[in-house]
């Protein structure tokens, strides 16, 4: 009933904000009202940033990390000071940010693009696994840290990859982040100290 007293444009914004992960209806209302009260310049800046998301953000064809549209490859991949023979395998691009904040990892990354989840219609064929095998060969990768989330889907993906790579005859040492990360917690939400300990205590598979 209360929606009927709000302007249509404001309701549309509330609905759009409310569709974002982790944004409750009440939070969406607060955000929308804040934007309404903000200056035109701030609103236009936000709108411009949103409009440029799909035109100025690209994906690295090797690591599948997010890059600027005018870049060819990820800076973390082309940085010669980083060890290309050590690869951390993550589900999503934001997981890279979480691991980088620890300051403990000097290898490179490979983004799977998700985790195996039959209920969501995500199978191995939807993930960047063939490209991973190609990277292992081309960069002579010696260790693969499987840093998928500590969730049912993340664990299933880790087990699948271990068996898949072994069956494919891919010779690479595989390890898994230590159990410092609570079950059910996504990598991007883990604190830096916990992630640092998880990296240091990773176990061979």
Please provide the spans of the model-predicted regions:
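Long C-terminal interaction/binding lobes of large macromolecular proteins
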Residues: 39, 102, 133-205
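Short Cys/His-rich Zn2+-coordinating modules
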Residues: 9-16, 38-60, 71
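Conserved nucleotide-binding/hydrolysis micro-motifs of P-loop NTPases
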Residues: 68, 81, 93-96, 115-118, ...
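Cys/His-rich short segments
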Residues: 49-96
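Extended interfacial segments that mediate partner engagement and assembly in macromolecular machines
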Residues: 28, 79-145
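Extended, structured, electrostatic nucleic-acid-contact surfaces
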Residues: 1-21
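Conserved phosphate/pyrophosphate-binding and hydrolysis machinery centered on Walker-type P-loop NTPases
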Residues: 3, 21, 40, 53, ...
